[in-house]
Amino acid sequence: MKHDLKHIVCIGGGTGVFAVLHALKDRAHVSAIISMADDGGSAGILRKQKIVPPNDLRKAMVALSANPELAMEFEKRDDAGFALGTHVIVGIQQKKGLEEAIREVSLELKVTGEVIPVTLDLVELSAELQDGTIIHGETKIDILNS
């Protein structure tokens, strides 16, 4: 790390965060603290299998990658809608754990900065509405805002 670079911490897990990470990767040392509440699409399928979905972690690592060719491969999707990178991370995760999967994939992608999950456990985002109703799941909460 160059000493003249600023250290910036980004917290989140949506499309905007990944665009910010990509824009900052050559201008600062970036630590990305990534939400683990994604439950849509392939992440929802992984959750049903009791696997912590690494989708947003993958996107953050790709955004911070200094290996653009491999990063592009990681984003290619199979017929079920899973990104190749998700398959790779889950494969390592099931054998060695999520932390080791992040470490190994970060090395292969030549990630500049750090990608840190907010938790290593399966979690569910919930929201309490003004009327006291509790909504569970990121996708259900997102629907309320559209």
Label each PLM-derived region with a short phrase.
Residues 1-51:
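Gly/lys/ser-thr-rich phosphate-binding loops in alpha/beta enzymes
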Residues 35-145:
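Electropositive, gly/pro-rich neighborhoods at or near active sites that engage anionic ligands
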